[in-house]
Amino acid sequence: MQTDTTDRRETCWNRAGSGGEQRQKVGLLVEGGGMKCAYSAGVLDAFLDEGIAFDYCAGVSAGAANLVSYLAGQRDRNRRYYCIYVKDPRYLSTRNFIKTGSLFGLQYIYGDMTNEGGEDPLDFDALMANPSELVFPATDAATGKARYFTKRDLRRNHYEPIMASCALPVMCRPVEINGRYYFDGGVSDSLPLKKMVKDGCTKIVALFSKPDGFLMKPQGHRRIYTAALSRRFPNTVEALNHRHEQYNRSMKRIRRMEQEGRALTFAPSGEIRIKTSTRDPAVMQQLYDNGVRDARERMKELKDFLQK
C-alpha cells in the first residue's frame, strides 16, 4: 500500500513540475496557529494518501513546518509532533520559558528532533527533490516586514528559517540568521496570498487553522508585547498593532477568489476550541482526525477543482 501511495504522489508531483502553456499554476496556502495546525496536518496527510500535489506551497509558522513534512512525503510525521511529542516539556512548557526565554523549544523541535539522528528526522533529500516550490515568511524584527524564505534557504540539519517563522513574539526569543533577528511570519504576513499571486498562482487551495468566517480582531495583550518589545524592536510592535488589518484584507480576497471559482478552502468546524499553546494530546488527535475526515469527504470536490 505504501508503494501505491508513493507512486500516485510522485506521478502527481511530476505533473505539477512539468509546466505547460495552458496549465494554471495552483498554490497551496497553509495558515499558522501553533497547535491549532493539527487540523491542517490531518488535511495534508489525506492529500498524501491521494497523491495530491501543488505547483507552489506557502505556509506560515506551524503551517510552514507542516508543509515541510508534506513535501518530504512523510505521512504521519506531523501528527506525531502534535499528538505524541507535545507532552515533552522540551517541546512546550513554562520550564522552557524560564530557562531559555521561549515557551516553545524551537531548537528541540526543529533541530534536535528534526536533524539526522534525531527522534523524528526530516527526509531532507525527499524535500529537496520535490519539484513543488516552498515559500514561507518570517518577520524581520528590526523592520517589521516579511522576509520570504524558500527551500534554497534550508540546509541539511540547519532549519533556522523554519524556527524563525515559528518564533512567536514574547512567547519566543527571535531567531538569528546571518546577523538579523526574526519573529513569527504571521506578524507581518499571516496569509501570504499577495505573494502567491505575485509569484504566478492563479488558483489557491487554503487550509485555515481557525473556523470558517473568522476575521481577526486587534491584537490582544498590547501592553504586554509593547513593554517587552518596543525598546529593541519598535517596528515589530507596529506590525503587531496592524496585523489584523492585513489578515482581514487577505481573507476577504481569498473569499472573493472562492466566489469566482479560483479558490477552495478548508477550515475546522469550531467545535474543538483550543489555544495556540494547548498541550492535550487527545484534543490534538481529535483535531487532526477532523482534518483527515474533512479532506476525505471533500476529495472529489478538490480533484474537480484542481482539474478545471
Residue ranges, per PLM feature:
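Patatin-like phospholipase
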Residues: 1-60, 68-308
